[in-house]
Amino acid sequence: MDLSLLLPKRSWEISGGADKISRVAMSLKNIVKNKYKAIGRRGRSHIAPEGSSVSSSLSTNEGLNQSIWVDLPPELLLDIIQRIESEQSLWPGRRDVVACASVCKSWREMTKEVVKVPELSGLITFPISLRQPGPRDAPIQCFIKRERATGIYRLYLGLSPALSGDKSKLLLSAKRVRRATGAEFVVSLSGNDFSRSSSNYIGKLRSNFLGTKFTVYENQPPPFNRKLPPSMQVSPWVSSSSSSYNIASILYELNVLRTRGPRRMQCIMHSIPISAIQEGGKIQSPTEFTNQGKKKKKPLMDFCSGNLGGESVIKEPLILKNKSPRWHEQLQCWCLNFKGRVTVASVKNFQLVAAAAEAGKNMNIPEEEQDRVILQFGKIGKDIFTMDYRYPISAFQAFAICLSSFDTKPVCE
């Protein structure tokens, strides 16, 4: 990328003017070209001993090249990243913003300051955005593809496969694993890596035998408290890298009498307080992934003991319930207004709103918040579903809730 094309006229006067900007822009091309030439001259069969002049010269050159980008004036760096961030609001162009954060530490810190969280920008940029609450106004629109043969579910950013095409951004993937006591969905940042020991592992969804109760686990502690009591933790079998935290419970109402009607569900968000949707309410967003794989192994008693310290768990969590549909006499079916995002009737379709009645009348929750759809999910074609979510839940939480709708529930229908 030619950085000189991104500069406004006023930036040409900063720290040496156009000549310095041109040199900086051209240096990146020279760095890449020289490295490829050096590799070609040495060949794959050449082995450089440790401490040799070759390795020392390479480290010197890398340090020199690194300093070129570090020494950019902050005003100029801010202006460059702001222009890239404003011009690339959609994927795959959004990759340029991610590339800015990969140059060096100073670029990464500046990019983190410029790029806002999804709650404010309505955009998903970094992997951590998948754990941050969605926007308050317009929802983030996604779609899910189901592969029946492999039991894999993939979440993409976009309106639909037909409209997004090859520009669809893969956000999360889940693989269904059958257990003797129920089903388990392993959620990953990758499309084909579902190992719990992998850095792509983000969490899981586990069901009971009847498929009426689901528990959402995350491998990162909630941002409001890095130390949770034993009731909110799952003891790892091997090491602390496989630690899981109970962040939500999904309950489907039993239909013992087999009466006619849609499914009824309730979601208890253990990591989101009811105050998040109150007037002036906020929720703390995670800012980074904690690398638990580098931590030392801990004995199981550390997770089972009650002396963990930290703040208390949320006493009044946010509760979501499915919006009651209306019966359409002419169509002879239950209907909800999905505003064109759902086109095929299915028992899996639902809309979730805040259960204000269960929270009590004195919770100071505005009426518009009580009627606002926080998550909606529905079918638009064979093995294709839409998922739209908004504040205060994250993409991972929304995806986990939608995955629960795919599991078979013979006693709930």
Swiss-Prot record:
Signal peptide: none annotated. InterPro entries: F-box-like_dom_sf, F-box_dom, Tubby-like_C, Tubby_C, Tubby_C_CS. One of its GO terms (molecular function) is transcription cis-regulatory region binding. Ubiquitous, with higher levels in flowers. Residues 67-122 form the F-box domain. Belongs to the TUB family. This is Tubby-like F-box protein 6. It comes from Arabidopsis thaliana. The gene is TULP6.
